[in-house]
UniProtKB/Swiss-Prot annotation:
The modification 2-(S-cysteinyl)pyruvic acid O-phosphothioketal is found at C116. This is UDP-N-acetylglucosamine 1-carboxyvinyltransferase 1. Pathway: Cell wall biogenesis; peptidoglycan biosynthesis. It comes from Enterococcus faecalis (strain ATCC 700802 / V583). Phosphoenolpyruvate binds at K22, N23. It is found in: Cytoplasm.
Amino acid sequence: MKKIVINGNRPLKGEVTISGAKNSVVALIPAAILADSPVTLDGVPDIQDVHSLIEILEIMGAKITFENNTLIIDPTEVVSVPMPKGKINSLRASYYFMGSLLGRFGEGVVGLPGGCYLGPRPIDLHIKGFEALGAHVTNEHGAMYLRTDEAGLQGTRIFMDMVSIGATINVMLAAVKAKGKTIIENAAREPEIIDIATLLNNMGAKVRGAGTDVIRIEGVEELHGCRHSIIPDRIEAGTYLAMAAAMGEGIKVRNVIYEHLESFIAKLQEMGVKMTIEEDMIEVHPSHDLKMTTVKTYPYPGFATDLQQPLTPLLLKAQGTGEIIDTIYAQRNKHIPELVRMGADASVEGNMIILNGPNQLHGAEVVASDLRAGACLVTAGLMAEGTTTIYNVEYILRGYDHIIEKLTALGADIQMLETEEQEGPFEVDQ
């Protein structure tokens, strides 16, 4: 077990470069097994989720090379084997193997996914999509068994009962080699969907409409390898923009796509954060006398649920009373008791978070309950007077590439240490 120790209230200055998108790469890697020759992914973040997926691929027989953020996957000798439950339990995005195994083999066994606990995240939509394509899906002893009959997967029209990025991607992976045409209606529109579609099309798939709410797929018989560059991580970018606004004395955030962050940047500007926006760089200038605002999360292009927690510490620096309402994951509020421990005037009322500011945070021992809560606590630690110790940092390492090194380069006093036996709070009530 590791912990992060931050000596806070120190100004940050310099440049930080954003890594490839975690929410893309966790689907791009399973998608690679659909090809009949090697797939090269550039800009792959060096995060724990990537290493877990690599281990799963190697168990399946893939040959892997991962150096300097370039991942080469040779799926030529991949076989359909039951997914190792330990890796699946620690990785929610492993459910993308359901779609890619169905697409390649017409069958698969995948343990029920884990990852961050954010309340119920049912995979009913995924199963409904697979069944519409002609698959038979059963839950046996905590694993999903996926099968097809001799006719294989058949293209069809699928209406998503609710907007789901995971279900949209999974159905895309299964449908690209199905017979005939598949139409996904009420599809998710996230940039990561476009990234997945770009990879699939480079492999020889015929996917149209990604980025809109109707995706059309014409099935093909085979897919080949290709080279693909992953889009920048808009959630990591938003996290560093919030840190820069909170503690920066001039920070340039490089390798960003402004259009992917419009709703987030609009909130920063509403608060009074001063920025210069260029083609692939955003510079955050020292900003004072921030104004409180209300945040309500929605599917893309609305305000991303993954960014409400990283923004919370900055909101606590602003004057006034504000609210955060997460319409995607109503239980995404486990960071609030930890911020209160640091002196925040914040509370949870139903599905709403109430914030009163400004607050001067103070160092404390806190625990990360999930990936984005961990990022929130890192930002809070940077803002706080005194020393903050964050436990359960394995969550943070799942999704932030070299966060210690990046923050150290900006002038933060931050380090990651091994925890002593019996040290620190390691669990959060869920």
